[in-house]
Amino acid sequence: NLAINHTLSWFFIVLSALICAYSFIPNFTFFFNSKKLLVFSVSTYLSICLLLFTCAVYTNGLTWFLTACIGILIGYEVIFVPIFLSRTKISRFKFIISFTAACVLTILLLINIHIWNSFRVVPAILITCYAFIPAIISAVICALRFNAFLKAGICIAFSTVVYYFTNFVVDKIFGTNNSSYKVNFSNWQQYSNGNIHFICLILLLSISILFIGVGIFRLCKKNDQ
């Protein structure tokens, strides 16, 4: 870069990109005898942030830098936190912690975006919390100690009902009227959205009933023995 352009123009971008690639091979873990997965996750995340920061400086676009870093952090948190907690005393609650942390980070992401681009952040946070409810409640149910088939059936049924009414909740929170739950299987052109939602609702509830039925049967069989 110095020889050709007589300045350090693209040098730092290439250097940060090489560091990012170096961390993913992975090479930083060779310097540690333990907790290599933690070293890998931290080093790769920081190297990505370094590359993004370098690009942001060169493009004068620091407004999106923190947004990108938080978004990537959400992905890392969802993948690695359950793994890190799997061998601890709180391993039963790993998914509760993971989904709750993801919800908090998503809210922080919305707040950060709101700082640079004004929008209705409070309704956005409310619908985010609503969308995370099935995941968090399902994680709580899975942490309880009872029949696995019953837990699966309850989680599917609860999540199905909550997500079925997502568009309705969005309309109520944002004051719109865009969702339609009208069902008419003889007219798919105008009622395709409602028809598909209804079919998914029935299929998923049927699956949940099947799981619950198997769970009850296994419990009854166990009690008879």
Name every feature range the model reports, one short phrase each:
Residues I13-S23, V42-L52, I72-Y76, Y164:
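Hydrophobic alpha-helical transmembrane segments of multi-pass membrane proteins
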Residues A21-N33, V78-K89, V140:
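C-terminal ends of transmembrane helices
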Residues C142-Q225:
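C-terminal membrane-adjacent module
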